[in-house]
Amino acid sequence: MNKNFYDSNVGAITKYTNVFGEELFILPCIAGTYAIGAINKDCRLRNMSLAVLQSFVYAEVASAGLKVLTCRTRPSDSNIQHPTSDIPKWQGPFATFESTSFPSGHAMRSFAVATTVAGFYPEKTWVGIVSYSMAALCSAGRVVSEEHWTSDVIVGAALGYFIGRGVVKFNNKIGNISSVDIQAIATNYGLGFVINF
């Protein structure tokens, strides 16, 4: 197969599948679904949107923390491809902020979101199928485009899944998250928050 033909087609496909793990795609989708839920007075859709935001934030923090602690080089790094390269694939904690391969943030975010969405609509099988398919396409695209090693994507997807499951379980426990009341309190001793649910 012609490498240029393969690279150009894979690049075109992964450009569209990577978007499912992008912050600039996920955050407007969360805002949009919350707005639709508010306009239609759909409490479950509003709750799901807030839970997806929780999952997104947890996945983002976990991904950033692990990337800084592992400092793994990406497969697309031209230096790592050279057989005589002195650059190790794992550089260790805080070695560099340029080696951010492990884990895949796209996979973690997309699976955290997919798991949360599917968890709020367990009776609608198609919701889970569509959500997990989008997450899987995003994750596979990261490997195919040589942005991540396969292990980066597998670990990112697994962590995203468990983050999403945890958020769904927590939200099922507290019930209607949109009824949560958060108040800021300012005193002479400092600032604080009170959360009532």
Language model features by range: what are they?
Residues 80-196:
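Membrane-embedded catalytic cores of phosphoryl/pyrophosphoryl-handling enzymes
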Residues 24, 28-31, 48-51, 55, ...:
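Alpha-helical transmembrane segments of integral membrane proteins
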Residues 1-33, 68-86, 93:
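N-terminal transmembrane-helix/juxtamembrane module of multi-pass inner/ER membrane proteins
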